[in-house]
Curated annotation (Swiss-Prot):
Pathway noted in the entry: Carbohydrate degradation; glycolysis; pyruvate from D-glyceraldehyde 3-phosphate: step 3/5
Gene Ontology BP terms: gluconeogenesis; glycolytic process
Known role: Catalyzes the interconversion of 2-phosphoglycerate and 3-phosphoglycerate.
Binding site for substrate: 10-17, 23-24, 62, 89-92, 100, 116-117, 186-187
Assembly notes: Homodimer.
Gene this chain is encoded by: gpmA
Protein name: 2,3-bisphosphoglycerate-dependent phosphoglycerate mutase
Length: 234
């Protein structure tokens, strides 16, 4: 049976991932560990014969640079790439920049877990004077939808942000049987998975996306979901 494969991958580990900090929309580089992760992922995709017609990523360099490495490794740097703020990581509001240890010490373990793993609970909003406030960032200045840019997000609001982009941009290409790779972030990929598999709240909050490992979703030509699997184990 002919199948359509969609490849999803969380960016390689970033400097703040290695420090266990809330990153969100803060634009942090890949760490050396992360660079090695995505290079290996690219080599594995090549060894399994993967090729693509189109690629999607966010406006954050840890995802963009991860995609660049993947495409270089499979010798497809020339394919079209679309970047969108809608594929950015979940915005962690005022938590951005702080380590999980610091937040747990200040607010307690239960509150930390609610902010991290709750479905509809958003952290405190980021303040306009915060060092990591993004509304004046040049990459967002030309957005007609600037009023939609978040100050903090829950997983639910992240899904709501991604849904129209999925419906209007990504899914039509899949229906057209294009071979697509999406390199994004833990929560934006969780959002896509919820949409793909129609998971409920309890199911999606249990999903964990590791850095730098391609996750494959297979569909038949009628876009009926068949199976999913990671390309390799770490």
């Amino acid at each position: 049976m002919s199948i359509i494969k969609l490849v999803l991958m969380r960016h390689g580990s970033s400097i703040w991932n290695d420090q266990d900090r809330f990153t969100g929309w803060t634009d942090i580089d890949l760490s050396e560990k992360g660079k090695n992760e995505v290079k290996y992922a690219g080599k594995m995709l090549k060894s399994f014969g993967y090729s693509f017609n189109f690629a999607y990523t966010s406006l954050l360099k840890r995802a963009i640079h991860s995609l660049w490495v993947i495409l270089k490794e499979i010798n497809q740097s020339w394919i079209p790439v679309e970047k969108s703020w809608r594929l950015n990581e979940r915005h962690y509001g005022a938590l951005q920049g702080f380590s999980k240890y610091e937040i747990e010490k200040k607010y307690g373990k239960n509150q930390l877990n609610e902010w991290r793993r709750g479905f509809s609970i958003s952290p405190p909003k980021i303040n306009e004077k915060d060092n990591y406030f993004i509304l004046n960032d040049k990459r967002y200045l030309n957005l007609k939808t600037k009023k939609l840019l978040p100050f903090s997000e829950s997983l639910k609001s992240t899904i709501d942000r991604i849904m129209p982009y999925w419906d209007g941009n990504i899914f039509p290409r899949l229906q057209n049987k294009e071979k697509i790779i999406i390199v994004a972030h833990g929560n934006s990929i969780r959002a896509i998975i919820k949409i793909l598999c129609n998971l409920n709240e309890k199911e999606i909050i249990k999903i964990n996306i590791p850095t730098g490992i391609p996750l494959i979703y297979e569909f038949d030509y009628n876009m009926v979901f068949k199976k999913k699997y990671f390309l390799f184990d770490r």
